[in-house]
Amino acid sequence: MQYPEPIAKLIESYMKLPGIGNKTATRLAFYTIDMNEDDVTNFAKNLISARRDLHYCSVCGNITDEDPCEICRDTARSQEMILVVEQPKDVMSMERMNDYHGLYHVLHGVLSPIEGKGPDDINIANLIKRLQKTPAKEVIIATNATPEGEATAMYISRLIKPAGIKVTRLAHGLAVGSDIEYADEMTLLKAVEGRQEI
């Protein structure tokens, strides 16, 4: 038996989200149908609002509803350190530890020849331009501990080092293949404190 078209379309929509397979999408679709109409309307409005009102900061590439973002506008933050991450969610993970007070730069991906992603496909060029205009003395590369993350870190390091800027990499505490997003605050703090020059 096939589901009625509205349910099938809803399931299909949920399956476009990362990590959501057919079973979970079906469960979410039926849960949505059982929600009261006001909650469904608010849910839909919030989805539309997030998509419409959020954009990437013109300075760092983080997701924001203002430009530049709150972090880039914060004059109390150290202008001498820029922590480079893969995705906006990684900024939120780093901010949870409440111990890093520098700036960020979001790449929106990593180098991945298998996926056809080269340097022009991620936010590296803007990082280089930014470093030419800022007093940054250190760039901390916090890409994930994956082969693509490591390759991206080495590539960025080779681009930046000739400018005389110290380039470091998050250290111990992060297992190979792990994502920053899933690390706890203490692990992230130890990784930042133990960063190593590359």
Swiss-Prot record:
Q: Where is the Toprim domain?
A: 80-175
- GO terms of molecular function: DNA binding; zinc ion binding
- Which Gene3D superfamilies does this entry report, sorted A to Z? 3.30.60.80, 3.40.1360.10, 6.10.250.240, RecR Domain 1 (1.10.8.420)
Zinc finger regions typed C4-type: which residues?
57-72
**UniProt keyword annotations, A-Z:** DNA damage, DNA recombination, DNA repair, Metal-binding, Zinc, Zinc-finger
Q: Biological process GO terms, please?
A: DNA recombination; DNA repair
Checking InterPro entries in the record gives: DNA_Rcmb_RecR (IPR000093), Rcmb_RecR (IPR023627), Rcmb_RecR_Znf (IPR015967), TOPRIM_dom (IPR006171), TOPRIM_RecR (IPR034137)
Answer yes or no on keyword Nucleus.
no
Q: Which family does it belong to?
A: Belongs to the RecR family.
UniProt function note: May play a role in DNA repair. It seems to be involved in an RecBC-independent recombinational process of DNA repair. It may act with RecF and RecO.
What is the protein name for this chain?
Recombination protein RecR
- According to its UniProt entry, this protein's organism is Latilactobacillus sakei subsp. sakei (strain 23K)
Q: Which gene encodes it?
A: recR
